[in-house]
Amino acid sequence: MGGLALLARAKGHRVTGSDANVYPPMSTQLEEQGIELIQGFDPSQLGEAGCYPDLVVIGNAMSRGNLCVEAVLNLGIPYTSGPQFLADHILPERWVLAVSGTHGKTSTSSMLAWILEDCGYQPGFLIGGVPQNFGVSARLGESAFFVVEADEYDSAFFDKRSKFVHYHPRTLVINNLEFDHADIFADLAAIQKQFHHLIRTVPGQGKVIWPADSHAVKQTIEMGCWSEQETFHIAEVTKGWHAKALSDDCHEFEVFFDGESQGVLEWALIGQHNIENALMAIAAARHVGVKPSAAIAALTRFVPPKRRLELLGTVHGVSVYDDFAHHPTAIATTIKGIRAKVGQSKITIVLEPRSNTMKSGVHKDTLAHSMLQADEAFLYQADTIDWNMKEAMEAAVIPVTVLHQIDDVVAKVSASAKAGDTIVVMSNGGFGGLHKKLLAALEVSPQFVQQAD
């Protein structure tokens, strides 16, 4: 929604917005762009009769009973959903490159937008995070090309279709597919049905790029695909895309297409998952005319989005990272990448299970295993979590501490830290400001202060 606000303003509209709790980086971005942000949902923000907004864009987190929503309906103010606004006002006559999938959407769409930018295509984009190569999550662009992070979550309380069915991409990337969003989907099959609807919107002359090793994606493709296809493979192949890691942490790898080397990429990112994200972005860029060698060169200058294994700081030799991982697969993948980078050094995970799916307990039986390659973990159990986290963590093979107060988490984590440790904070929310609190606590933690004396 913050990105949509930027696009609407760029189209010449006066834009205001409201929310209950906006946190960085989006709150910072809106402030820097001069967009007024109103805290809360007092209907008075809609103005007086005769001065109502021309249009209200309602986010999918809003439901009936919200004071502003009820006022919009009662007053007859025109309204729409975010995806429909994008489809009606931004995407017409654009070559849409949509990046979808359970994991890696923000990273892959950021890579793709940067490749196009670096190669002179001047694309528009709308991305869930803030790509640091651009500093904003959205812009109109100066060409026909528009990159969009295509989410399967529903559009609004009045439109329960997945957001991405509104986008009509000509280039579609499906990164991967797992069960998620248990609050709106009954099972994986329900999610696959929505992806099938998305595939139906891609024109015959368009292209669908997908991972051949994903059984769930393959099943979805087999439901019907009328467009050209390109596939990514983990193993070496003579048809499609694959990569060969040249370093243990995957920060260097060679790219192959149809069995031919396209070049070697050495960059700041780590992990097999980022190799896969890069291949998808390179393949999508090739569809609009970018040579793979040029895309590889562009990615050497790529800076990952904020909150995607972002180094927040190093205090007394302790490195603190921020990561958006909120699904057991993403948690395990991130830890695997960090382990390859730091070797035998201690890795501490600080996790807030905040997504609706996590809070429901759907992933409680796989959460402990997802942290297997870490050395210890501290979990924050908020009041909104109604399953016994401590009981679920009995299956863990590493020490796991469950705490109910954020300040207690900060105190325990900072007290256990030693020089050379890596701490990874994982949450898809603001985590009650824990990140800054932890960095501050490490600065004055007794074990480091005593050493300094």
Question: Where are the regions that the model predicts?
Answer:
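Glycine/charged-rich beta-loop-alpha catalytic/anionic-binding loops adjacent to active sites
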Residues: 95, 234, 257-267, 313-318
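Short, polar loop motifs at secondary-structure junctions
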Residues: 20-23, 41-43, 60-63, 84, ...
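Gly/Ser/Thr-rich loops at beta-strand to alpha-helix junctions
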Residues: 1, 63, 105, 215, ...
